[in-house]
UniProtKB/Swiss-Prot annotation:
It catalyses: uridine(55) in tRNA = pseudouridine(55) in tRNA. The active site is at D43 (nucleophile). The keyword Ribosomal protein does not apply. This is tRNA pseudouridine synthase B. The gene is truB.
Length: 306
C-alpha cells in the first residue's frame, strides 16, 4: 500500500515528548505520502489520540476538528506556573494547610461545566495582532487576550484526592468532555480560582478525538509494523467515518455520472447534508439548498484502501 494512493483517517497515538508536527513527519516518512494533516494540536507534554487525515481525507479535517474531545488528567492545587502546566516556572504559591473536601472539589468542577468563557494562556498558539501568544510570552511581553467561548459537557473527578502537608498541595484526577478549542490548562487554573488557590494542570491525556478512542489509536511503532507487513489498510480508516452522523445515500450509475460533472441532485432526503456513496465508497458530501442537493465536498478519486 505504501507509495500508492491512500485516502482516509489514521487515529495515531502521540506520546509525550513529541510535537504534533513531529508526529505528522513520522507518518509521512512511514507511509511515503506528503499530503497528511492533523485535526487538533496536542502539546508536547500531552499524550493521546491525534487523528491524522491522509490524502483526500484532509478535506475532512474541519469535520474532525468540530467533534468534541475527551481528556483525562490531573490538577494540582497549591501553586501556579507561567504555562499553566508543569513545563513553566512557578509564579505563585498558595500552600494548603488542610485539604479540600471531595464535595468542595466536585462543586468547583461543576462550576466550570456548561457554556463557559475562557482567556487563552499566554503560552498558546492563538494569534493576536499577527503574532502568536507564545511569541509575546517568550519575549517577556504581555498583551490583551481575546475571550473565547467553550462548552464543557462533563467535568468529573475520577479518584480520591491526595493531600501533601509537606508540599502544601492537593492533587486529583479528572475526566472532561469539551468542545474544540477548549484549553484544559486554563480549566485547571480556573478550578483553582474557584477554590481560592493557585493551580496547574499536572498531567493530561486525550482519550477521544474525531470520534476515535485511545484504544483505537496506533503508535508510531505499530504503524511501522503495519507498513512492513503490508497491512496499513487495517489501521487507516475510510474517510466517511468522519461523516458518520450524516445520512448515507447509495448512488445509481446515472447519479454517480451526474455528480462526476458537478450536477445537482434531487433526493428523497430532508437533512442539511448527506454523504453520497458509489460502489461502497464515499464520493461526495452534498448540501441541501432550494429543494436540491448541491456539491459541498468532493471525493471522486477516493477508493478503498487495499
Amino acid at each position: 500500500m505504501k507509495g500508492t494512493a491512500m485516502n482516509g483517517i489514521l487515529p495515531l497515538y502521540k506520546p509525550t515528548g513529541m510535537t504534533s508536527a513531529d508526529a505528522v513527519y513520522h507518518a509521512r516518512k512511514i507511509l511515503g505520502i506528503k499530503k497528511i494533516g492533523h485535526s487538533g494540536t496536542l502539546d508536547p507534554n500531552v499524550d493521546g489520540v491525534l487523528p491524522l487525515a491522509i490524502g483526500a481525507g484532509t478535506k475532512a479535517v474541519p469535520q474532525l476538528m468540530a467533534s468534541g474531545k475527551v481528556y483525562t488528567g490531573e490538577i494540582t492545587l497549591g501553586f501556579a506556573t507561567t504555562t499553566e502546566d508543569l513545563d513553566g516556572e512557578v509564579v505563585d504559591k498558595t500552600p494548603l494547610t488542610q485539604p479540600f473536601t471531595a464535595d468542595q472539589l466536585d462543586a468547583a468542577l461543576t462550576a466550570w461545566t456548561g457554556n463557559i468563557t475562557q482567556i487563552p494562556p499566554m503560552f498558546s498558539a492563538v494569534k493576536v495582532n499577527g503574532r502568536r501568544l507564545y511569541e509575546y510570552a517568550r519575549a517577556g511581553e504581555t498583551v490583551k487576550r481575546p475571550e473565547r467561548q467553550a462548552t464543557v459537557s462533563q467535568f468529573t473527578r475520577t479518584d480520591e484526592p491526595v493531600f501533601s502537608a509537606t508540599d502544601g498541595t492537593q492533587r486529583f484526577r479528572f475526566e472532561v468532555h469539551v468542545s474544540k478549542g477548549t484549553y484544559i490548562r486554563t480549566l485547571a487554573v480556573d478550578v483553582g480560582k474557584t477554590l481560592g488557590v493557585a493551580a496547574v494542570m499536572s498531567q493530561l491525556t486525550r482519550v477521544k478525538s474525531g470520534g476515535f478512542t485511545l484504544k483505537q489509536a496506533v503508535s508510531i511503532e505499530q504503524l511501522k509494523a503495519h507498513a512492513a507487513a503490508g497491512t496499513l489498510a487495517d489501521v487507516i480508516q475510510p474517510i466517511d467515518i468522519a461523516f458518520a452522523d450524516l445520512p448515507q445515500v447509495d448512488l445509481t450509475v446515472e447519479q454517480f455520472e451526474a455528480i462526476s460533472h458537478g450536477r445537482f441532485l434531487s433526493l428523497d432526503q430532508q437533512t442539511p447534508r448527506v454523504r453520497l456513496h458509489f460502489a461502497g465508497v464515499l464520493k461526495a458530501i452534498y448540501r441541501r439548498e432550494d429543494d436540491q442537493y448541491r456539491p459541498d465536498l468532493m471525493f471522486l478519486a477516493n477508493e478503498k484502501n487495499v
